[in-house]
Amino acid sequence: MPKNSKVTQREHSSEHVTESVADLLALEEPVDYKQSVLNVAGEAGGKQKAVEEELDAEDRPAWNSKLQYILAQIGFSVGLGNIWRFPYLCQKNGGGAYLVPYLVLLIIIGIPLFFLELAVGQRIRRGSIGVWHYICPRLGGIGFSSCIVCLFVGLYYNVIIGWSIFYFFKSFQYPLPWSECPVVRNGSVAVVEAECEKSSATTYFWYREALDISDSISESGGLNWKMTLCLLVAWSIVGMAVVKGIQSSGKVMYFSSLFPYVVLACFLVRGLLLRGAVDGILHMFTPKLDKMLDPQVWREAATQVFFALGLGFGGVIAFSSYNKQDNNCHFDAALVSFINFFTSVLATLVVFAVLGFKANIMNEKCVVENAEKILGYLNTNVLSRDLIPPHVNFSHLTTKDYMEMYNVIMTVKEDQFSALGLDPCLLEDELDKSVQGTGLAFIAFTEAMTHFPASPFWSVMFFLMLINLGLGSMIGTMAGITTPIIDTFKVPKEMFTVGCCVFAFLVGLLFVQRSGNYFVTMFDDYSATLPLTLIVILENIAVAWIYGTKKFMQELTEMLGFRPYRFYFYMWKFVSPLCMAVLTTASIIQLGVTPPGYSAWIKEEAAERYLYFPNWAMALLITLIVVATLPIPVVFVLRHFHLLSDGSNTLSVSYKKGRMMKDISNLEENDETRFILSKVPSEAPSPMPTHRSYLGPGSTSPLETSGNPNGRYGSGYLLASTPESEL
């Protein structure tokens, strides 16, 4: 009796099999089924076709442990956006008030859709292309669109890692190279670089020394050789990590996923000990409740939830496809989502502690500069000394004393006050000066670290953390490209991965020009937002409305051993698609109301200026969006008009946990012997499907079905509910 005798008995039950077929199956004797040959008639001479019987579950690589898998998912979902985008949005949208819409949308959009992607990847054990082709062939373009979006994101994301590598190596100096403005000699006279003097040392180092940025996107300025080398190093590291496979990548994840938390914890402890850190923390948690009613806040919170978990990229599906079938992906979805949120809050605490310290430093600098102005006015008798409170000591002027003096002068000299050019030096104003995106990491943080004791050490730790966070996300992004392509087209993994990295490096040279930062902005803000939203909406529709939410819940029950909460049924069926549709509409309206643009650094002004993209850049932007979404309608149309095979000529029946994978080509509906292994018997259960999708009630024809002969989900995709059936 085979080890899976109960399954064999059930599958061989005469309830769904004709008597003659059952008799033939009863004659099977145990042999090595891997050598069996399948007779496929219908061709001249009754052609014999050898069938490869290797089990998919055994052939596919698997994680060495559950911990490796969890760390990989955390490494993919927790990225650079948690360090700079979430804190920026929190600061911009009302501090603590922003956390409320974020949490609500995380629960009704983030966790359900994250669970959905984990489940389909684990159940079907394929990358994004294979998964969506399996569920609904006409929506198979979803997987290709995911791959394209991953490619677009990977192109510029690795550039940011390259920037971090550049700063990492520059951190092994004391003092840090961005702590002071460079001095330029004009003959015998030494003067401070004008661009740096007008801005700041950290701003100058970022724009001039690191990026050597041009004044607009239209001025390419040639390649920045320093960043080109850093980009080459970044792609080399990513390529080696992906080529080694998930087992080796899993080992890397032990370090790359955990190290950032060590650094963030150290930064938080150190940050809380800084003067003014409490001011920053209080500013973060002081809610501005009026912001909660602003639709823009909800739109940005939804977008952040969407990107934070990596939905639609295919990386989540790729990683979960290497899991065991009985893995509790429901627990994984909740755990990874919570850790992602916790990381965002932890990073925000660190950012606001550092910004509170920086705000106090800048506020004190403001007080000193304005006190010097007042002293000048006193010496020139523009102001009377009677306006200065007697207890004020200019040698040790506090912020409180300055504010008292400022208010007196403003009251007495009301008519001439504006001409004095005095600044109130309010701490709140400094805290409200939001720094977005790369500026937060490469300007605000670097400036704060120049005031840290042992600043090179903290700088090395910070940029090593950014590199690790970036690499964790990049490995998942590359998995979203390589896994579905390798699964679908069976290309050699090593050659394909190396080819992808070389191609991405060459295209990535666009981002290491002097104008490269503007292209990074274009790709980051526009190339992925709309395509990813559309991808996730269609993923949700494919599972909840085409495959069927009830059927999907039943499949999850069989896979997990328990039935998921009813909550997910309503989220997948109604709430999540509706919210995503509203988000898409809002994004399109926002794009139409506000023409796309970017912040350009003007050298002569030493300041940023918002510019609109030129026509050719707009054409490129639209092309990126179209290219990312084009596979979806193209595949749908081709399969709808039968111009592209949807797999109807090959029926693939997967038997997990010891069952065979059989490919039976060109089956004739009325010849039941087409399902029987040739005269060489097999120990393994017969690959004959026994569900009524194949054998209708009272039917003697193996492929005769009631209703649509091609099934509900496309030609050749009749779903068999065997005990371990595919999704």
UniProtKB/Swiss-Prot annotation:
Glycans are attached at residues 186, 393. The modification Phosphoserine is found at residues 13, 20, 665, 701. The modification Phosphotyrosine is found at residue 377. It comes from the Eukaryota. One of its GO terms (molecular function) is symporter activity. It is found in: Cytoplasmic vesicle, Secretory vesicle, Synaptic vesicle membrane; Postsynapse; Presynapse. GO terms for cellular component: cell projection; GABA-ergic synapse; glutamatergic synapse; membrane; plasma membrane; postsynapse; synaptic vesicle; synaptic vesicle membrane. The chain crosses the membrane at residues 70-90, 96-116, 148-168, 223-243, 254-274, 301-321, 335-355, 461-481, 491-511, 528-548, 574-594, 618-638. Residues 698-709 have a biased composition (Polar residues). GO terms for biological process: alanine transport; brain development; glycine transport; L-leucine transport; neurotransmitter transport; neutral amino acid transport; proline transport; protein catabolic process. It is a multi-pass membrane protein. Synaptic vesicle transporter with apparent selectivity for neutral amino acids. The transport is sodium-coupled but chloride-independent, likely driven by the proton electrochemical gradient generated by vacuolar H(+)-ATPase in an overall electrogenic mechanism. May contribute to the synaptic uptake of neurotransmitter precursors in a process coupled in part to vesicle exocytosis. It is linked to Intellectual developmental disorder, autosomal recessive 48: A disorder characterized by significantly below average general intellectual functioning associated with impairments in adaptive behavior and manifested during the developmental period. MRT48 patients show moderate to severe intellectual disability and additional features including progressive tremor, speech impairment, and sometimes behavioral problems. This is Sodium-dependent neutral amino acid transporter SLC6A17. It comes from Homo sapiens. The lineage of its organism: Eukaryota, Metazoa, Chordata, Craniata, Vertebrata.
